[in-house]
């Protein structure tokens, strides 16, 4: 009898526990349902889209950090700027006049082209060797380095141009290298000519202009930064080269159109139908376009060497190291990586055009004032660099 009573108690407890468990489970599910209903009552398509866009922006920021700090968008800008950068941003290179028309404004303008002390300028131009001996991998930003070359960096005719890059960009490292310094940088970056085909190709080139062309690609490949010919001067600060809408994108190569001769006889005057200029280039170190370009130039140099055709023939410069092969390397990469891509994509270009991590600037950017092919005045807001064409490479 006692055994039956105990059995009944156990069975009753089990049934009660099961009922309690089912009740609790149902209550939890009910709470979830109520939560979902309350969320649906607050739901609007605008709110959902805002949340999604906000999430997208947060994810993009994790991978697309801005290459350049933008003063207007960062309330804590002062916390990140060095004294030199702060000084730079306090002196705008552009402004509007009283009639709201654009006018050129430099901290140091071209009216002061001959007004400088040579000894003082020479002191500022001396660049310690260790400022350009460091390695930066591809996928880095374009570093704050400005590269220029000259047989005599301290010649007054050279300094009257190069100083504008240094004075207007005090937070950048600025190097004007002579032939021996350029050679040393190539060897330190790519190895001695006894073991490096690249360095040996550089050493074998018979014309100074060939070496000058090749060096700009090599230094940008190895170190990155901005290369500009010694007879150029900035019309805008380098930060202004990238439009506001692209400043949070990872831009790793900036090129400008040199020529856009939309006419049947274009090949009588230019190497390519649309041609990119080489007198000013900005790049992150290790960019694939630069690697491919260096490979092509190295292969061509060795091919000419092996066939005993290395000569001082300036007619081959356009195709050997000049704008022809430079343009081909860019166009081939963009077509292969983001294609189809052809000259039709950039003919009569009037605004900066971003393709992947390559920013293509219209002809006015680096070729203002040429008077044709859509090039506008050096006073135009899109004019970034003035090229004075003072070089005489054909006489070398």
Swiss-Prot record:
Membership in a protein family: Belongs to the glycosyltransferase 32 family.
Keywords carried by this UniProt record: Endoplasmic reticulum, Glycoprotein, Glycosyltransferase, Golgi apparatus, Membrane, Signal-anchor, Transferase, Transmembrane, Transmembrane helix
One GO cellular component term: mannan polymerase II complex
The name this protein goes by in its record: Initiation-specific alpha-1,6-mannosyltransferase
Residues spanning the membrane: 8-28
Record text about domains: The conserved DXD motif is involved in enzyme activity.
Cytoplasmic side: 1-7
Motif DXD motif in this chain: 229-231
Keyword Transmembrane: yes
Reactions catalysed, as given in the entry: Transfers an alpha-D-mannosyl residue from GDP-mannose into lipid-linked oligosaccharide, forming an alpha-(1->6)-D-mannosyl-D-mannose linkage
Membrane topology according to the record: Single-pass type II membrane protein
GO biological process: cell wall mannoprotein biosynthetic process; glycoprotein biosynthetic process; protein N-linked glycosylation; protein N-linked glycosylation via asparagine
Segments on the Lumenal side according to the record's topology features: 29-396
Primary location: endoplasmic reticulum
Molecular function, one GO term: glycolipid 1,6-alpha-mannosyltransferase activity
One Pfam family this sequence matches: Gly_transf_sug
SUPFAM superfamilies from the UniProt entry: Nucleotide-diphospho-sugar transferases
Species of provenance: Schizosaccharomyces pombe (strain 972 / ATCC 24843)
Cofactor(s) this protein requires: Mn(2+)
Gene3D superfamilies in alphabetical order: 3.90.550.20
Classification via PANTHER family: INITIATION-SPECIFIC ALPHA-1,6-MANNOSYLTRANSFERASE
């Amino acid at each position: 009898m006692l055994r039956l009573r105990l059995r009944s108690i156990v069975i009753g407890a089990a049934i009660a526990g099961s009922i309690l468990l089912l009740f609790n489970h149902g209550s939890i599910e009910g709470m979830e349902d109520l939560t979902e209903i309350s969320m649906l009552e607050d739901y609007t398509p605008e709110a959902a889209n805002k949340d999604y866009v906000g999430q997208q922006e947060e994810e993009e920021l994790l991978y697309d950090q801005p290459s350049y700090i933008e003063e207007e968008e960062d309330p804590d800008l002062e916390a990140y700027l060095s004294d030199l950068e702060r000084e730079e941003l306090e002196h705008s290179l552009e402004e509007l006049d009283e009639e709201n028309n654009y006018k050129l404004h430099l901290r140091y303008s071209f009216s002061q082209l001959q007004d400088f002390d040579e000894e003082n300028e020479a002191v500022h131009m001396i660049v310690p060797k260790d400022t350009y001996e460091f390695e930066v991998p591809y996928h880095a930003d374009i570093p704050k380095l400005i590269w220029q070359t000259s047989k005599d960096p301290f010649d007054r005719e050279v300094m009257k141009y190069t100083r504008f890059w240094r004075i207007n960009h005090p937070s950048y490292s600025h190097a004007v290298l002579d032939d021996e310094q350029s050679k040393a940088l190539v060897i330190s970056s790519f190895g001695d000519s006894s073991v490096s085909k690249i360095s040996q190709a550089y050493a074998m080139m018979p014309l100074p202009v060939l070496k000058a062309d090749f060096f700009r690609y090599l230094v940008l490949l190895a170190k990155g930064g901005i290369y500009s010919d010694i007879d150029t001067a900035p019309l805008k600060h380098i930060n202004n080269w990238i439009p506001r809408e692209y400043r949070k994108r990872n831009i790793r190569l900036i090129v400008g159109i040199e020529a856009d001769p939309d006419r049947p006889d274009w090949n009588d005057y230019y190497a390519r139908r649309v041609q990119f200029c080489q007198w000013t280039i900005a790049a992150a170190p290790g960019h694939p376009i630069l690697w491919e370009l260096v490979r092509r130039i190295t292969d061509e140099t060795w091919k000419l060497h092996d066939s005993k055709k290395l000569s001082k023939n300036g007619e081959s410069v356009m195709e050997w190291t000049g704008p022809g092969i430079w343009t081909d390397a860019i166009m081939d990469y963009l077509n292969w990586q983001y294609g189809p891509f052809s000259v039709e994509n950039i003919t009569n270009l009037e605004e900066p055009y971003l393709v992947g991590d390559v920013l293509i600037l219209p002809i006015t950017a680096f070729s203002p004032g040429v008077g044709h092919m859509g090039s506008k005045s050096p006073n135009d807001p899109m004019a970034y660099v003035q090229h004075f064409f003072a070089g005489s490479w054909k006489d070398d």
